[in-house]
Amino acid sequence: MDKYTKGAWSLNPTTGEVDVDGDFDCSVSRLQSFGGIKFGEISGSFKCTRNLITSLEGCPHTVGADFECSVNPILSLEGGPKTVGGTFTCQNSPSLTSVSGAPETVGRSFLCLLNSVESLEGLPENMSVGTGFDCSYNYLTSLVGVPKIISGDFRCTGNDLKSLEGAPQTVGGEFSSDGLKIPEGEWSMDTLIGIFLDGTPQQKHLVAPLVDPKVIQQQIDENPEGMLVKLKGVLKHPHFRGLKWPEGLEKEKDLLSDLGDVGL
């Protein structure tokens, strides 16, 4: 333990787990497991990259800073931390086919690229990611399962995506996929409609599920006020004429539609 710890470690008598006040880094040590040790809370970073670890069992449940487990023959993220204060990185692990066990909360970015992940449906239903999300260079055919809100960049290039079904509802940074790049701050229903109408055949096919009136109606039913604001620039478009709004929002809809016409 001392060899890999920068700070102080202690055995919690209540939980039987090893807590670290500082950083733990056992990278490039040819470890096959954590030798029966079960970590609890790490105040700093936890890194176990470039080993022979086949399972994340024993990893801490809480990491205050970054968590890195890249270049290991793991099959899933089961056993990994539930809370990561910094960036979660698991890349260059060709054996990784599932994101099941991913953290529920990531303070910064979630980086899961250059693996063999086939689906993102194993991610926690209400997963929170502070900044970016990168799932590039896997074997994804859809984005179903990703968090609804990404404050930073969202990257999914180098996959087998048939469409952008399941893409985040909000992207604060740049959106990047094969054949489509949307600049920072421009991810909106207005932009997606524009691509659906005027984009290349590939781009139109990619965004089609995101502008499907049935999908949008479901989002309206879940959050009518929020969707009213998101759609204000396209409310009068023929594509959305059949959308149904709560009776109390009809006047607001007309007002926002008029504001959208004048660019407000």
Task: Label every model-predicted segment.
Residues 9-18, 39-40, 60, 81, ...:
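Short, exposed beta-strand/loop patches in secreted or surface proteins that constitute
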Residues 35, 60, 81, 85, ...:
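Intrinsically disordered, low-complexity segments enriched in glycine/proline and serine/threonine
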Residues 1, 16-18, 22, 56, ...:
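Intrinsic disorder/low-complexity signal
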Residues 34, 56, 77-80, 98-102, ...:
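Canonical leucine-rich repeat
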